[in-house]
Design a protein with these regions (language model features):
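N-terminal secretory/targeting leader peptides
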Residues: 1-69, 77-313
Length: 313
């Protein structure tokens, strides 16, 4: 609707829910092949098709604020990397879309790093799943539409999903009575900035006049922040409703738990970065940003494995 209004009807978009044309995990190939024009989804879903997607949305213990990601995309070369990544698959990357941090909904209490071991938990795959597997979790990859029934039937013990407002409306508090979060310093361990994006088939993109291409990119940027702030407001009420209306307990891990998870991160960052040259380019760019005075999360001495041995890029 926003695009239609902004273009005075010269460019209109007809949207379909996931599964209406193809399944969630088939969208990438369908748009690449021109089965339909575009999709709106999470970049983290496509790491198996394009390893650089690992670094197009947040991953454990890296950039963890929306403004940091926006800066990387718009000022530090991230947009060009994303467009090259999707361009290799006949798609044009319109821009990042801010969403929310992700929660873990659990049927059982998980109060420490040690209590994750042996649990069967849905994660989106890639580097995120790898870090939890290193901690002893049995990870499961499921499309979003299959998460609720899997939790309800006890097929999995817990699941990552999106933020509080969306999850409350989906009824997660009716079947999983625990929300697992990090401490205030690290509210979300695995996807603190769960970015989405819009990809359009390259042939479809080239048919759009230049001024409408620019309008479409501007509309995506506007939608990104409108969506983000609306979700943050809705989350405030949702957390209250989870606890007061559905009897959900919010468990916060300790900083000491975070440090135990964190030791798995650097070697896995580098393993995923080395899967292809573009992934490495993205990670190197973010690693330099992470070491700046402005961010200051790491120094070069922190790029070591669990035994303290230096890792080379």
């Amino acid at each position: 609707k926003l695009v239609g209004d902004m273009s005075e009807g010269k460019l209109t978009i007809e949207g379909f829910p996931a599964g209406a044309i193809v399944g969630t995990f088939e969208m990438f190939d369908a748009v690449k092949a021109g089965v339909f024009d575009a999709y709106h989804s999470f970049d983290v879903y496509w790491v198996g098709k394009q390893p650089a997607c690992t670094f197009l949305s947040s991953y454990p213990f890296s950039l963890d604020r929306p403004d940091q990601w926006e800066t990387w995309y718009r000022e530090l070369g991230g947009m060009e990397i994303a467009r090259e990544a999707y361009g290799q698959h006949n798609m044009y990357y319109l821009g990042p879309i801010q969403h929310d941090d992700n929660l873990i909904h659990s049927k059982v209490p998980i109060r420490s790093f040690e209590e994750f071991k042996g649990k069967k938990i849905r994660y989106p795959g890639g580097i995120i799943a790898d870090i939890y597997r290193a901690a002893g979790v049995s990870t499961v990859l499921l499309p979003g539409g299959e998460v609720y029934p899997a939790l309800e039937k006890g097929v999995i013990d817990a699941s990552d999903f999106v933020g509080a407002a969306v999850n409350y409306n989906l009824g997660f508090g009716e079947i999983a009575k625990y929300i697992i979060m990090g401490p205030p310093s690290t509210p979300c361990l695995h996807q603190p900035v769960d970015l989405m994006s819009v990809q359009i088939n390259m042939n479809s993109w080239k048919k759009i006049p230049k001024h409408l291409q620019q309008l479409l990119e501007a509309a995506v940027a506007m939608h990104s922040w409108n969506q983000y702030t609306a979700i943050q407001k809705a989350d405030l009420k949702a957390f209250d409703d989870f606890q007061k209306k559905q009897g959900v307990t919010v468990i916060r891990l300790k900083d000491s738990d975070i440090e135990k998870f964190k030791k798995f991160a650097p070697p896995l960052w580098v393993t995923w970065a080395k899967k292809n040259p573009l992934a490495l380019k993205a990670f190197k760019s973010q690693w330099e940003f992470l070491k700046t005075v402005k961010v200051g999360y790491y120094t070069e001495a922190d790029l070591v494995d669990a035994k303290g041995k230096k890792i080379t890029l």
